[in-house]
A protein has these predicted regions:
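A glycine- and small/hydrophobic-rich beta-loop-beta segment
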Residues: 79, 83, 91-167
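Gly/Ser/Thr-rich active-site loops/lids in small-molecule metabolic enzymes
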Residues: 53-59, 85-92, 96-104, 115, ...
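Conserved NAD(P)+-binding/catalytic subdomain of aldehyde/semialdehyde dehydrogenases
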Residues: 1-90
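Phosphate- and divalent-cation-binding pockets in alpha/beta enzyme and binding domains
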Residues: 16, 40, 72, 101, ...
């Protein structure tokens, strides 16, 4: 359980946890999101401590069919755009009408937000709407983008989901907005960004676990595998390695 709580933040907090202070004992693992300074501090201190990931700007990819309400899709895109001017919101749809209507709705809704400055900057610089002939064509793009958040706002989301290989978290169906995942749905929303979902997963208890291998040989077992170890060590030019095995074989 939790036995210490410290109210600290920023890159200096990451340094304090990694190296320790006169009041804070150094830790082994640092996890969780933060701003660009926190992300860079975690990157630089990886090796001194373990980290979960280096999280970048937030991302959302929405795959939507023509049956969606454009205003709702626009709201989903802006839910990430309002985070930061460097956030990215992408829509892939098979409906040209939806694409046009969503583009118009984004402009109207963004202008009314208290987070307008960040949302408009994000959408203008990083917002993308892509039209495809068939929603099946969206899957290779989604796997290539490996987005932090992937919304499948389609009639049969399970069919597309079965072909998704790379995404931080997937939200199935028109009634599953990404914002619910941020706050109350259950799965952790500390997720890989910047296409890192190709090789990493969201924060979980596994980030606080590790494995230790162990080996035990008896004399008979060493007699079987030892000569191969000797040969490999000699080929690698490491005679002391070979000798540590050979002496046991000759004993």
């Amino acid at each position: 359980g939790v036995d210490e709580v410290w109210r600290i933040g920023g890159a200096q907090a990451i340094a304090a946890l990694a190296y320790g202070t006169d009041r804070i004992a150094p830790v082994d693992v640092v996890t969780g999101p933060g701003n660009a300074w926190v992300a860079e501090a975690k990157r630089q201190l990886y090796g001194v401590v373990g980290i979960d990931m280096v999280a970048g700007p937030s991302e959302i990819l929405v795959i939507a069919d023509g049956e969606n309400d454009p205003a709702i899709v626009a709201a989903d895109l802006l839910s990430q755009a309002e985070h930061d001017p460097t956030s990215q919101s992408i829509l892939i749809t098979d409906s040209a009408d939806l694409a046009r209507n969503v583009e118009d709705a984004v402009k109207v809704q963004a202008a009314a937000l208290t987070t307008r400055k960040a949302a408009e900057a994000s959408w203008n610089d990083h917002g993308v709407i892509i039209t495809v002939a068939d929603l099946a064509d969206a899957v290779p793009l989604a796997n290539r983008l490996a987005a932090e958040h992937l919304q499948l706002s389609v009639a049969e989301p399970e069919a597309l989901f079965a072909r998704i290989r790379h995404a931080g978290s997937v939200f199935l169906g028109r009634h599953t907005p990404e914002a619910v995942g941020d706050y109350i749905a259950g799965p952790n929303h500390v997720l890989p960004t910047g296409r890192r979902a190709r090789f990493s997963s969201g924060l979980s208890v596994l980030d606080f676990m590790k494995r230790t291998s162990f080996i035990q040989l008896d004399q008979a077992s060493l007699a079987k595998v030892g000569p191969a170890a000797v040969r490999l060590a000699e080929e690698e030019g490491l005679p002391a390695h070979a000798e540590s095995v050979r002496r046991r074989l000759d004993a």
